[in-house]
């Protein structure tokens, strides 16, 4: 008996994980039966063939994109994920997209070619050519008898009657359409008589529009040196040509509006630009006029006569200031003289002389006293120093019986090593010198 014992829930969960993990999204064709749509909006159905059947579910957010109403007995192509409904243990498919069997095969081819061309870089945004801002000539590659051409011509005539139009007629449906569309694209590029190309047609089924999903058409659009606008079918129709073209228009009429200039809009733009130009000119004129007035005023201020007047006024001002300064100086001097006169009157000169003489006598007495005191102090200090110096004199030492011996060079002899045999030495005593010879 196995050690792993599953519950029913565990088994169903493991089976669901195994199914979902081992099956990527798959394409499946079969006949619809048991189709139901409850109030939730989800679709529940069975897909079957002669030998087997499988339960399927398509949730509401997915089935809203389906362009038809499924019916029992209808053959369809679905893209789905394999799963398992755990509460009942039912193996089922969760449908992502659904197409009638014929269109479904075309849709599968569409997706495969789209992935291939995208991988090669044919859809790269950096390779898209820019449409001219103002086209002088536009080329139209479409059926010469289709309603799309008439819609384009009508809009171009209404919006931009002066725009040159070149029609490159081609089939846009059937076996010959692909080759003719490629041929017209190459012809337009060879002639170089237009600025931009519109490639498109009116609405139709997927089979009707299929020539615009052909690889040859996609590569011709990619090789074109002229900018190309794809305008195939209605807004909901998407083709390979839309991805490769430099710009996609939702309809042929919209493409005509993209390449044409609306005359009324152009006139309005011209009026607006004229207004802006007038306003700019007025601002420039006003600014230049103000500048001219400023320069004229500066020129007037810098005129020699004006400068001379200004200098004269400055000289007069300086002269006036100098006169005021002299007058103030004279008044100050006069005030000082008056003050001195008053002081002289208050203190007569003889009295002041007598007072100064008395002060001078006092200073003389004080000076004599200070000088005598300084001389006495210096004499006493000198006598003290002389006594000390006399005590240190070599003569005093000699007087006490000592003597000083000197070699012939006059240096004092302090050791027997300082003399040699035969040298004459001099001996200094208190009252004279004695010359001796060393034996």
From Swiss-Prot:
Compartments, as annotated in UniProt: Cytoplasm
Example of a GO cellular component annotation carried by this entry: cytoplasm
Deleted gene: phenotype: Essential, neither gene for this protein can be deleted.
UniProt keyword Nuclease present: yes
Any one GO biological process: DNA catabolic process
GO MF term set: exodeoxyribonuclease VII activity; nucleic acid binding
UniProt function note: Bidirectionally degrades single-stranded DNA into large acid-insoluble oligonucleotides, which are then degraded further into small acid-soluble oligonucleotides.
Subunit-level organization: Heterooligomer composed of large and small subunits.
PANTHER family: EXODEOXYRIBONUCLEASE 7 LARGE SUBUNIT
Record protein name field: Exodeoxyribonuclease 7 large subunit
Source organism of this protein record: Haemophilus influenzae (strain ATCC 51907 / DSM 11121 / KW20 / Rd)
